[in-house]
């Protein structure tokens, strides 16, 4: 970032030049603000590429790029291979409950998808949009632990340019990615909208709010949401400019499903004020969870996180 200079509408001239002139298009602005894809921590192999993995430990990721599996193949047709950086914490039995496959987005990107069957008898499935610096390999253990504790299956996907998904991260791709994930969950697994809970974390709240503003579902969970990209980078921003990225604050009023907002009061990345503002704009907001003292990446470590999720899903949503 440039050194601060004279300010115009809350921005220094140096900040404006760096953000909007190099080059001046919303997709590049969004990329500067949001996307930090890690080196992939997993591969997805088609049946003919599989190699036997040791029981109870993930297989190392092959160096060669895997060929894409057929998108129409049935569940279990592909296999997940995790690298050491994936931090796998479970046995081979749990790994066998994870199904991986590819879908295709409207922008013609190959989308890596994951279905974690944590609670086969559960009514609800979370469509989980993860944060900006992880991929499915790193999130896999968390999904198993979370789903088993809140009694939900979990469907997730990697954004374009993350993990095994093709393309590059962009705002337009975010929206196309979650659309493809939504359709895959509905058609491949037969999950109806009234049984889908949209869960977005950090940058994942952006596609979550966009989808929820267009489709009704069982519920929406916004974990450390942001109002818009500029409001994160420049907290003095009071309105949405035409060049702003991720304008969730302008979409949240169109969400007709129940919305649970979760935010840490000491969030050092997306200020707590973002969660408050999103909560206040929700037409059907339920009691929020403000985690006292929590930052951006540690809310899950607080006991009230799981307690509030269980209360919301098991007692505040229909379960018959």
Swiss-Prot record:
GO molecular function terms listed in the Swiss-Prot or TrEMBL record: palmitoyl-(protein) hydrolase activity
Catalytic residue list: 202, 267, 296
Keywords: Cell membrane, Cell projection, Endosome, Hydrolase, Lipoprotein, Membrane, Palmitate, Postsynaptic cell membrane, Synapse
Free-text tissue specificity from the UniProt record: Expressed in brain (at protein level).
Chief place of localization: membrane
Compositional bias segments (type: Pro residues): 55-65
Membrane topology: Lipid-anchor
Catalytic activity: S-hexadecanoyl-L-cysteinyl-[protein] + H2O = L-cysteinyl-[protein] + hexadecanoate + H(+)
One Pfam family named in its UniProt record: Hydrolase_4
InterPro entries, sorted: AB_hydrolase_fold (IPR029058), Hydrolase_4 (IPR022742)
Region (Disordered): 50-75
Known EC number: 3.1.2.22
Compartments where located: Recycling endosome membrane; Cell projection, Dendritic spine; Postsynaptic density membrane
Keyword Lipoprotein among record annotations: yes
Top enzyme class: hydrolase
BP-aspect Gene Ontology terms: negative regulation of protein localization to microtubule; positive regulation of protein localization to endosome; regulation of postsynapse organization
Domain of life according to the entry: Eukaryota
Gene Ontology CC terms: dendritic spine; endosome membrane; glutamatergic synapse; plasma membrane; postsynaptic density; postsynaptic density membrane; recycling endosome membrane
Residues passing through the membrane, by range: none
Residues forming coiled coils: none
Function: Hydrolyzes fatty acids from S-acylated cysteine residues in proteins. Has depalmitoylating activity towards DLG4/PSD95.
Protein name, per record: Alpha/beta hydrolase domain-containing protein 17C
Species: Rattus norvegicus
């Amino acid at each position: 970032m440039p050194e601060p200079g004279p300010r115009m509408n809350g921005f220094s001239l140096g900040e404006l030049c760096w953000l909007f002139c190099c080059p001046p298009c919303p997709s590049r602005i969004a990329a500067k603000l949001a996307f930090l894809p890690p080196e992939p921590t997993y591969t997805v192999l088609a049946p003919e590429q599989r190699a036997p993995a040791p029981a109870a430990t993930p297989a190392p990721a092959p160096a060669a790029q895997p060929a894409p599996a057929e998108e129409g193949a049935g569940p279990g047709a592909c296999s997940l291979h995790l690298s050491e950086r994936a931090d796998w914490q479970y046995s081979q039995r749990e790994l066998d409950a994870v199904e991986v496959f590819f879908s295709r987005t409207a922008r013609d990107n190959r989308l890596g998808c994951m279905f974690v069957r944590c609670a086969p008898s559960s009514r609800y499935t979370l469509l989980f949009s993860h944060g900006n610096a992880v991929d499915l390999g790193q999130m896999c253990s968390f999904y198993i632990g979370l789903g088993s504790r809140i009694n939900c299956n979990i469907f997730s996907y990697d954004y374009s340019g993350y993990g095994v998904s093709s393309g590059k991260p962009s705002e337009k791709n975010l929206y196309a990615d979650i659309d493809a994930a939504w359709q895959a969950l509905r058609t491949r697994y037969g999950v109806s909208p009234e049984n889908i809970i949209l869960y977005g974390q950090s940058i994942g709240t952006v596609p979550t709010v966009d989808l929820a503003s267009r489709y009704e579902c069982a519920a929406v969970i916004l974990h450390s949401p942001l109002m818009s990209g500029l409001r994160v980078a420049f907290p003095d921003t009071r309105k949405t400019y035409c060049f702003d990225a991720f304008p969730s604050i302008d979409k949240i009023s169109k969400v007709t499903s129940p919305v649970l907002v979760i935010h840490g009061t000491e969030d050092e990345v997306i200020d707590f004020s973002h969660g408050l503002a999103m909560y206040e704009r929700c037409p059907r907001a339920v009691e929020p969870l403000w985690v006292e003292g929590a930052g951006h990446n540690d809310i899950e470590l607080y006991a009230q996180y799981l307690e509030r999720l269980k209360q919301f899903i098991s007692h505040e949503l229909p379960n018959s």
